[in-house]
C-alpha cells in the first residue's frame, strides 16, 4: 500500500540550539556544524541549493557544491555562461540552503555575489581530475543539445587533443563568492517548535543574533 505523503513526518529530538551555545561569529558556527556534518559521513555534506533570480523576476534553484568558505563568504564554481551565471551577472544576489537531515539541521544564507579572482579559479581548476577539466570545455551548460553523443564526441576530441597534458581553465568557467548579509541556523526540535537563530550583519559594525519563531 502506498503511504500517504501527508502522513510523512518525523519528530526532531536530537538536540537544541541556544544563544548561549551559539558562537557570536556565524562563520565559526558554520564551521562547527559543517565539521559535524563531515563526521556524520554524509554523502556530500557540501551540497547546497543556490537560488537565483531570472530576468523576469522568477526564482530559479539548483544544487551545487560548496568548495571553500571563510569570512569573505561561500564559494562555488560553475560555467559563467550557464543560466545561473547569467542570472548572477544581472542580479548579483543569491540564497543558499544546506540540509543535513541526520543532524536535523538546516543553514540558510542570503547575500550579494561576486566572482572570485582568476588566481582562485585557476588554483581550484588545476586541482580537479583531468577529465573533469575537459568536461568544463565540453559542456555549453544550460544549452539545448541533440543527444548525449554530442557530449561524448566532444570529450573524445579533447582527449585526443590534450592526451593527458595540462588542460587550461576555460575563460567562461570560474568561481562565485556569496557574501552573506544573513545566516540562519535551524535546529529541529520536538513538536515543530524548532530553534532558529539568525545572524544579521549590521553594516560597518558587527553581527547580531536574533531568535526567530518557528
Curated annotation (Swiss-Prot):
Protein EC: 1.4.3.5
Q: Please state the pathway this protein functions in, per its UniProt record.
A: Cofactor metabolism; pyridoxal 5'-phosphate salvage; pyridoxal 5'-phosphate from pyridoxamine 5'-phosphate: step 1/1; Cofactor metabolism; pyridoxal 5'-phosphate salvage; pyridoxal 5'-phosphate from pyridoxine 5'-phosphate: step 1/1
Which enzyme type, at the first EC level?
A: oxidoreductase
Give the record's cofactor note, including how many are bound. Answer: Binds 1 FMN per subunit.
Q: Which GO terms describe its biological process?
A: pyridoxine biosynthetic process
Q: Which residues bind FMN?
A: 62-67, 77-78, 84, 106, 141-142, 186, 196
The record lists its disulfide bonds as none
* Catalysis: reaction(s): pyridoxamine 5'-phosphate + O2 + H2O = pyridoxal 5'-phosphate + H2O2 + NH4(+); pyridoxine 5'-phosphate + O2 = pyridoxal 5'-phosphate + H2O2
The question of whether Flavoprotein is a record keyword is answered with: yes
Q: Which cofactor does it need?
A: FMN
Q: Which molecular-function annotation in GO is an example for this chain?
A: pyridoxamine phosphate oxidase activity
Where, in this chain's numbering, is substrate bound?
A: 9-12, 67, 124, 128, 132, 192-194
* Keywords linked to the UniProt accession: Flavoprotein, FMN, Oxidoreductase, Pyridoxine biosynthesis
PROSITE patterns named among the record's database cross-references = PYRIDOX_OXIDASE
Q: Entry's HAMAP family?
A: PdxH
User: Which family does the similarity line name?
Assistant: Belongs to the pyridoxamine 5'-phosphate oxidase family.
What this chain does, per the entry, is described as:
Catalyzes the oxidation of either pyridoxine 5'-phosphate (PNP) or pyridoxamine 5'-phosphate (PMP) into pyridoxal 5'-phosphate (PLP).
Q: How does it assemble?
A: Homodimer.
Protein name, please? Pyridoxine/pyridoxamine 5'-phosphate oxidase
Q: Which gene encodes it?
A: pdxH
Amino acid at each position: 500500500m502506498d503511504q500517504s505523503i501527508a502522513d510523512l513526518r518525523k519528530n526532531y529530538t536530537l538536540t537544541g540550539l541556544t544563544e548561549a551555545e551559539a558562537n557570536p561569529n556565524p562563520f565559526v558556527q558554520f564551521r562547527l556544524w559543517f565539521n559535524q556534518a563531515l563526521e556524520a559521513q554524509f554523502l556530500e555534506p557540501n551540497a547546497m541549493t543556490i537560488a537565483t533570480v531570472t530576468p523576469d523576476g522568477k526564482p530559479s534553484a539548483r544544487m551545487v557544491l560548496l568548495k571553500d568558505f571563510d569570512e569573505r563568504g561561500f564559494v562555488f564554481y560553475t560555467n559563467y555562461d550557464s543560466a545561473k551565471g547569467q542570472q548572477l551577472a544581472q542580479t548579483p544576489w543569491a540564497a543558499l540552503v544546506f540540509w543535513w537531515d541526520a543532524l536535523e539541521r538546516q543553514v540558510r544564507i542570503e547575500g550579494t555575489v561576486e566572482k572570485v579572482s582568476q588566481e582562485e579559479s585557476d588554483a581550484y581548476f588545476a586541482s580537479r581530475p583531468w577529465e573533469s577539466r575537459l568536461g568544463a570545455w565540453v559542456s555549453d551548460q544550460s544549452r539545448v543539445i541533440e543527444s548525449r553523443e554530442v557530449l561524448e564526441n566532444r570529450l573524445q576530441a579533447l582527449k585526443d587533443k590534450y592526451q593527458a597534458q595540462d588542460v587550461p581553465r576555460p575563460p567562461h568557467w570560474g568561481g562565485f563568492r556569496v557574501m552573506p548579509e544573513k545566516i540562519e541556523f535551524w535546529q529541529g526540535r520536538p513538536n515543530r517548535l524548532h530553534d532558529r537563530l539568525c545572524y544579521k550583519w549590521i553594516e560597518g559594525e558587527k553581527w547580531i543574533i536574533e531568535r526567530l519563531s518557528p
